[in-house]
Amino acid sequence: MNKVFGIVGWSGSGKTDLTTRIISYYSQKKIIVSSIKHTHHDFEIDKEGKDSQKHVRSGANEVILYNEKKWALISKLQQKSTSIYKILEKFEKKNQLILIEGLKHSKFPKLEVIRSSIKKPYIYKNDANIKAIVIDQEISDIKLSKLPIFKFSETENIGNFILEYFKR
């Protein structure tokens, strides 16, 4: 299986901003990286009136949007829920790393993004799979953690930490 690392935190913590900056950093280093964005909400990747949406609405169980440069699969063939492991099987083996944004209760190694203005429980305190913490500013009780702590702006250091994690 591909190397998988998660980026978790509460809504509004800055997960997407951090994830996209890490992806950009890896892309500049010619590291083949892909990502999964987990959401709790229903979503549509089609727009109203587009042909692919008409295929889905007419009853197609799976629709692939395709051109010579990219493709996307819309599938309604899942059981009650689709396991993240089934989704990971869809990725090409040539990926060197897959980042998962969200999915905070997964068993993958991950880091927690903490924004000081969000008053929610820290995930790392009850999750041994959290391997590092990313903060927007100094937070006194987080200093007591034995985990590595990065500032939100330290994209390169965070990216390198993730890469080094898999060399252990």
Feature locations, PLM:
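Walker A (P-loop) ATP-phosphate-binding motif of ABC ATPase nucleotide-binding domains
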Residues: 4
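Phosphate/Mg2+-binding loops and adjacent switch elements
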Residues: 97-151, 155-166
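Hydrophobic anchor at the beta1->P-loop junction of P-loop NTPases
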Residues: 7
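Phosphate-binding/switch loop-helix module in NTP-utilizing enzymes
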Residues: 75-105
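Conserved lysine of the Walker
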Residues: 15
